[in-house]
Amino acid sequence: METRPTALMSSTVAAAAPAAGAASRKESPGRWGLGEDPTGVSPSLQCRVCGDSSSGKHYGIYACNGCSGFFKRSVRRRLIYRCQVGAGMCPVDKAHRNQCQACRLKKCLQAGMNQDAVQNERQPRSTAQVHLDSMESNTESRPESLVAPPAPAGRSPRGPTPMSAARALGHHFMASLITAETCAKLEPEDADENIDVTSNDPEFPSSPYSSSSPCGLDSIHETSARLLFMAVKWAKNLPVFSSLPFRDQVILLEEAWSELFLLGAIQWSLPLDSCPLLAPPEASAAGGAQGRLTLASMETRVLQETISRFRALAVDPTEFACMKALVLFKPETRGLKDPEHVEALQDQSQVMLSQHSKAHHPSQPVRFGKLLLLLPSLRFITAERIELLFFRKTIGNTPMEKLLCDMFKN
């Protein structure tokens, strides 16, 4: 299924000249004669649109991946944005670049981005660099019995020790989780225009939807479709998942898609807690309608509580990746050819989540348990209801299984 993007209205922000900060800032000569900046990045290496760290020249100017991807999407799709403030003077910096698409595109052009340089064909992107230094040190305390199989009898004393094998296996598994997470975000056009997948902003940035602008149903359906596509793409890019029999891959994806979608929606701050699709229906005297009202109210309340718990814990990207793996690898799923392998992957995911939580949140000894307790709440709203609410308008009567299979094959 190919969905066409819908240009979303920007949030209302206080009008301010985007160049005011740059005009008022006086640069002082730096060690390399390039001037210094409070961000610690040389001005010549900053994104000329938002001031974030530049990843090189894009379409004629130094720009970050976020702004270059936004410009490419806008030009290729001939998107037309409207500044809701109306003045066309919204601030465009690292903190506010996602708030007004019209002003962001305007600043891209003013900064010198060349529309003619945007190629019609899809250009390959360089493989993202994954930093795993911290994970290397975290494997020191990893329980080998859960991470690596026992060494066979008669192993040469010069061969790898069980502990070194455990470290290598654990390191590889965590690397594959994060690489899959990165690959699912490499092409910004696979995600909604208002979800900056290359951003280094906090885990829960300001939602692209605000209470001052309507949370349009078309926008929610569009974003939902893209989040589901990202979830499928994440699974496809997970080497340990691809190593399973193809039938097992399909069965696991059909079983877990709704949980993967909800995790992605929470991670990228889709406003599920205020989504009009989840608003309880109007009360009715009929008993059946009253029952549906009660169920819808319960689902909405549980979802709001779940989102609040995720935000209270400030779940980080690595934890999200591990939690996605936990909901994907369910050995109890019926029809699996190799449930033992799936169970081993589930154990790996749990060990990685535990070790990461202990290493990065040592002051929260119960954090791992709290993260695990979040997962059952994702299944409170059934997959059938999520399909009805978020995807029925987009896919019509097409079975979700067929949609997932098409996404997976393509």
Curated annotation (Swiss-Prot):
A zinc finger (NR C4-type) spans 47-67, 83-108. SUPFAM superfamilies: Glucocorticoid receptor-like (DNA-binding domain), Nuclear receptor ligand-binding domain. There is a cross-link at K185, K330, K337 (Glycyl lysine isopeptide (Lys-Gly) (interchain with G-Cter in SUMO)). Residues 44-120 bind DNA. One of its GO terms (cellular component) is nucleus. Eye specific; found solely in the outer nuclear layer of the adult neurosensory retina, where the nuclei of cone and rod photoreceptors reside. Pfam families: Hormone_recep, zf-C4. Its main location: nucleus. GO terms for biological process: cell population proliferation; eye photoreceptor cell development; negative regulation of cell population proliferation; negative regulation of transcription by RNA polymerase II; neuron differentiation; phototransduction; positive regulation of gene expression; positive regulation of transcription by RNA polymerase II. Di- and tri-sumoylated in developing retina. PIAS3-mediated sumoylation promotes repression of cone-specific gene expression and activation of rod-specific genes. Sumoylation on Lys-185 appears to be the main site. Residues 153-162 have a biased composition (Low complexity). Residues 118-140 have a biased composition (Polar residues). It is found in: Nucleus. Changing R309G: In ESCS; impairs protein folding and stability. Residues 169-410 form the NR LBD domain. Changing K324R: In RP37; uncertain significance. InterPro entries: NHR-like_dom_sf, Nucl_hrmn_rcpt_lig-bd, Nuclear_hormone_rcpt_NR2, Nuclear_hrmn_rcpt, Retinoid-X_rcpt/HNF4, Znf_hrmn_rcpt, Znf_NHR/GATA. The keyword DNA-binding applies. Keywords: Disease variant, DNA-binding, Isopeptide bond, Metal-binding, Nucleus, Receptor, Repressor, Retinitis pigmentosa, Sensory transduction, Transcription, Transcription regulation, Ubl conjugation, Vision, Zinc, Zinc-finger. Residues 118-162, 193-215 are annotated as: Disordered. Orphan nuclear receptor of retinal photoreceptor cells. Transcriptional factor that is an activator of rod development and repressor of cone development. Binds the promoter region of a number of rod- and cone-specific genes, including rhodopsin, M- and S-opsin and rod-specific phosphodiesterase beta subunit. Enhances rhodopsin expression. Represses M- and S-cone opsin expression. Homodimer. Interacts with PIAS3; the interaction sumoylates NR2E3 and promotes repression of cone-specific gene transcription and activation of rod-specific genes. Component of a complex that includes NR2E3, NRL, CRX and NR1D1. Interacts with NR1D1. Interacts (via the DNA-binding domain) with CRX (via its DNA binding domain); the interaction represses S- and M-cone opsin expression. Interacts with SAMD7. Belongs to the nuclear hormone receptor family. NR2 subfamily. This is Photoreceptor-specific nuclear receptor.
